[in-house]
Amino acid sequence: SAILCPIVIPFLHKLKFGQQVRDDGPQAHLKKQGTPTMGGLVFLTAVVITSLLYIRDNPRIIPVLFMTVGFGVIGFLDDYIKIVMKRSEGLNPVQKLIGQFIITGIFVYYLMCSGEVETSMLVPFTGGFEHGIYLNLGFLFIPFVFFVVLGTDNGVNFTDGLDGLCTSVTILVATFL
């Protein structure tokens, strides 16, 4: 993404793909009208390229990559509605959540059908992987995965905004994908 940003950001400026600021928002945000948006494409491209380099050695990357691209599509649609359709709100929260639920549901379904998933989790600070205490979540594993995935995705979304705060958070999340 460090290589792509200097190329893509000026291109987004040229296309006038800038942030639309709501009139009823904070006055401080008005000066940021036109801040380039759709920068998520840069991060998504970097994550996809990096993942594809390792996919042959670790095919377990595929479902996580699917989920990442799916969430990226939701972000793209949100930005597209804001920029091209000139609706500063983009997708409403319910539409975003429905999309996230569908993508996460497909991911969880794949995990459960693959037979490779372990529904037990290590209780922290109980002795490590070999001697620790494990809690078998059983079918509670499904809502747990939804909670973790949707919480992580929306945590990044809440941090995202006009100030470029998403960059540091996205780097952390992408590192642990």
Where are the regions a protein language model picked out?
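"…together with the soluble PPM/PP2C metallo-phosphatase catalytic core" -> "…together
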Residues: 1-177
